[in-house]
């Protein structure tokens, strides 16, 4: 019992630390707005994600309370905290299963996909070369794929719709997805998903998740525009792709194949 309570206490205190940092981040956005570069906001947000994992508060409590423990492990108190810890564990398992089910859907969808046409693969390899990506990345098409997306940490894969696209439109989509890969957004989204699983009880944890997703897209757009050359053409293509996804539940890219 004591071990489970200690684990939950460390997780709870790390949630408090991460949440305080997130409030600071929101204050920066409100009062400084465009005075700080987007990449700085994104970097701070990534540090906040890590803070939700680091039990800094738990360690400080033990250091400054004479190597003792802030909670009294006797009688009713330990029983109450044990019950709370069990409730947290049940919620964490349920959230993991929920994300796991989404991951399973993507893996199943991958089995339904097929290799792209040769000219698409050539364009894909040219874009990879231009972005300086050497790792082998699979590119597939599927009839159930509505919008381009990237999935996989160990075996990264880019999924494209079957519909024929103009070469410039196709390049824009590929640049966008490969930029996500180059920026390690799949990894960070995986970190964010695990954060939600651990801190599911926190009312604003999904807001942190959404902000990480939004800023990943912002930084990706700013980076990809440089390869496309025209901001207007880039955002026109992105807008058209997003319109096609209306009413369709897009799968997240944090998948561990």
Label every model-predicted segment.
Residues 2-257:
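Membrane-embedded and juxtamembrane structural elements of multi-pass membrane proteins
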């Amino acid at each position: 019992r004591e071990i489970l309570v200690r684990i939950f206490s460390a997780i709870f205190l790390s949630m408090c630390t991460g949440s305080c940092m997130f409030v600071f981040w929101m204050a920066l956005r409100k009062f400084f707005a465009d005075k700080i570069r987007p990449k700085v906001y994104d970097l701070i947000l990534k540090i906040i994600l890590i803070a939700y994992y680091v039990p800094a508060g738990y360690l400080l409590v033990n250091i400054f309370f004479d190597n003792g423990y802030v909670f009294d492990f006797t009688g009713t108190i330990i029983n109450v905290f044990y019950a709370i810890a069990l409730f947290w564990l049940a919620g964490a398992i349920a959230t993991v299963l929920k994300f796991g089910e989404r991951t399973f859907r993507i893996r199943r969808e991958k089995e339904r996909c097929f290799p792209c046409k040769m000219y698409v693969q050539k364009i894909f390899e040219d874009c990879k070369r231009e972005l300086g990506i050497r790792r082998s990345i699979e590119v597939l098409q599927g009839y159930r794929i509505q919008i381009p997306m990237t999935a996989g940490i160990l075996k990264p894969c880019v999924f494209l719709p079957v519909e024929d696209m103009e070469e410039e439109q196709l390049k824009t989509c590929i640049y966008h997805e490969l930029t996500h890969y180059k920026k390690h957004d799949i990894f960070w989204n995986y970190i964010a998903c695990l954060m939600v699983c651990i801190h599911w009880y926190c009312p604003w944890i999904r807001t942190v998740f959404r902000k990480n997703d939004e800023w990943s897209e912002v930084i990706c757009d700013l980076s990809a525009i440089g390869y496309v050359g025209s901001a207007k053409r880039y955002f026109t293509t992105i807008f058209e792709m997003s319109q096609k996804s209306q009413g369709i539940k897009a799968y997240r890219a944090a998948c561990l194949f």
